[in-house]
Every structure is written in structure tokens, then in C-alpha cells.
């Protein structure tokens, strides 16, 4: 049976020295989107604060890098942050489960802003967005048509549509993928069980058996399948028949026309990997219409270093915090 969203009950509250967190929900269409709302130290509900929506990578959840690293540390710097689970994933509702549909993912951002503007302590004129990996691509795409976002940042932002089209890097990879998806949809329409595949190998042993050595794949397995980053809301499952829209989608389409907000792009200067966030960072920088845009290269950092490693994420935040302070204020 498909897993449903957690019931929208009184939020649980967790307090740390420098921020407070509440688990909340907001609506996307007919289902609940689960989110963690973080408040800065000495939060005063009679005042108004800038807010930042934090989006997780493909296959991830709010308890990983988007919330536990960037959401927490931005809250400690005086911002309200909202890290959410994508629709159909993690603790959020929506069907079919484990879908990766760009239109649905982008709509989550608009619904997140709809939620924030109902909170009396959020200044609706000072809302920004930050996305990590595929969440960065979705954040950029959302910001093009969601003018309530006043500042945009990506950390190793990746264009998921490009990744899907490139596939195994053979000329007909995208067409072969679409043919396979079409066949699977036909089978499911006739009663077959949904095909749940995986994003990455399920263990280091499976990685070695497959003979995969690309730095992004190796470090993804280390992050997602070990205590380093493993979370129940990130089960490494993907509904294969949901992928056709992603193959025909481009996260940066029309950025040269519609992406005008101040933009800060963070990429790693270490070994480039298969997910392509290094080149996507340059592509986005060159295409964005934003008159204020910066490209930060963290020396020696790989894609996954910028998920959770203290030194690289610290260097990213050294520029992200003043960027958001300049454009949103604290």
C-alpha cells in the first residue's frame, strides 16, 4: 500500500542552542507537503524576518543536506528557513509514490511560498530560495515564474533534464529511455506492478560489483547508504514510469529571459563528476539574465563535499550568508 503523508497535527518542536525547529505541513493540490520550519535564536513572533526555502537533491529528503546543513546554518544566521520533502517523496503525500516529475517538483516551491506568506512573522517581500544538486535546478526553474522569490542560490545545482537526456552518453540514450518508459507505462496500464528502480547502487559492495568508479557515483553511495547521510525519507527508490517528463525538461530553459533575481551559484573545484554540476554552474551563470550574479568555486571540493563536509560547506556559507543578507536583510 502506498505510504501517505503524516497527519497535519500540532507541530513537534525541537530546540538547539542557535535555532528552533517545527515540523509543519502545507498543501500542494490535494495532499500535504511535509516540511521543517526553522527559527533563529531569540525568535520573536511579533517581529518579521526574511525566509529562505531550502530544496533537497534528487533522491534526497529534508533531513539531509538541505535541512540539516544549509537550513540549520542559515537559521543560525538569523533567517527563517523552510526545508521540505518533495511531493510523492519522503514524508510528503502525493501519488504515485517515488515519482520524479519536474512540474510537480516546481509547484512545490510555489506552494512553499504560499505557506510562508500566511505566517505573520515572515516578511513576504524578503523571501529567497536555495537548492542543492537537482533541487538547485528546480529552484532556478521555479524562480523564473515565481516572482515572490527575491534572491536565488544554488549549491552544486544540477539540471536534471540534461542528466536524463545524456543517460549513458550514447547518441540515442534519451530515445532509448523514452521507449523503455513507454513500454513500462503500457505494462502498468494493463495491470503490471509499478517498476521501482534505484538512483544509485544500494551499497558499496554493489558499487564495486558494478565496476563504477566515477567520483559522483562513488561519493553518492558513501553519502546515501552509510550513516554519513542515510535517512528513512531517502530510500533510493524511483518510479521508472514517471520519468518521461524529465527527459523533455530543461531546468534552465528561458533563464536568459526570465531569471532576473540576484543569483549566487556554488560549485566544487575538485574532480568533476557524472552529475555535471560543475558545467551546469557555468551554464547557468552564462544564461541567467540576472544583473547581479556570482559564481563561487570552492577549491578542491567535490559535488558531495558540498553536501555535508564542514570545510567546503563552511566556505560556501561564507558567501551565501552575506548574499542573502544583502538581498533579503536580517
Where are these regions (language model features)?
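Alpha/beta-hydrolase-fold enzymes
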Residues: 140-223
Amino acid at each position: 500500500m502506498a505510504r501517505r503523508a503524516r497527519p497535519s497535527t500540532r507541530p513537534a518542536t525541537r530546540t538547539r542552542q542557535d535555532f528552533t525547529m517545527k515540523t509543519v505541513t502545507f498543501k500542494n493540490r490535494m495532499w500535504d507537503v511535509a516540511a521543517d520550519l526553522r527559527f533563529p535564536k531569540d525568535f520573536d513572533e511579533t517581529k518579521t524576518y526574511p525566509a529562505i526555502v531550502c530544496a533537497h537533491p534528487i533522491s534526497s529528503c529534508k533531513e539531509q543536506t538541505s535541512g540539516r546543513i544549509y537550513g540549520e546554518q542559515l537559521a543560525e544566521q538569523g533567517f527563517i528557513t523552510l526545508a521540505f520533502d518533495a511531493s510523492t517523496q519522503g514524508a510528503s503525500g502525493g501519488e504515485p509514490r517515488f515519482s520524479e516529475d519536474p512540474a510537480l517538483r516546481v509547484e512545490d516551491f510555489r506552494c512553499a511560498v504560499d505557506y510562508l506568506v500566511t505566517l505573520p512573522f515572515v516578511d513576504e517581500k524578503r523571501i529567497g530560495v536555495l537548492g542543492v544538486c537537482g533541487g538547485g535546478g528546480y529552484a532556478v526553474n521555479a524562480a523564473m515564474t515565481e516572482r515572490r522569490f527575491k534572491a536565488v542560490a544554488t549549491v552544486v545545482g544540477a539540471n536534471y533534464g540534461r542528466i536524463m537526456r545524456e543517460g549513458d552518453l550514447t547518441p540515442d540514450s534519451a530515445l532509448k529511455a523514452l521507449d523503455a518508459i513507454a513500454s513500462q507505462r503500457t505494462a502498468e496500464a494493463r495491470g503490471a506492478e509499478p517498476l521501482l528502480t534505484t538512483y544509485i547502487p544500494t551499497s558499496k559492495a554493489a558499487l564495486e560489483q558494478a565496476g563504477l568508479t566515477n567520483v559522483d557515483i562513488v561519493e553518492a553511495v558513501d553519502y546515501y547508504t552509510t550513516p554519513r547521510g542515510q535517512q528513512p525519507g531517502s530510500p533510493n527508490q524511483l518510479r521508472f514510469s514517471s520519468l518521461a517528463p524529465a527527459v523533455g525538461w530543461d531546468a534552465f530553459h528561458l533563464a536568459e529571459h526570465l531569471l532576473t533575481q540576484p543569483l549566487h551559484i556554488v560549485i566544487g573545484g575538485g574532480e568533476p563528476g557524472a552529475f555535471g554540476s560543475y558545467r551546469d554552474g557555468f551554464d547557468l551563470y552564462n544564461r541567467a539574465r540576472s544583473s547581479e550574479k556570482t559564481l563561487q568555486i570552492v577549491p578542491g571540493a567535490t559535488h558531495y563535499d558540498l553536501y555535508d563536509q564542514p570545510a567546503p560547506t563552511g566556505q560556501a556559507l561564507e558567501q551565501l550568508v552575506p548574499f542573502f543578507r544583502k538581498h533579503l536583510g536580517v
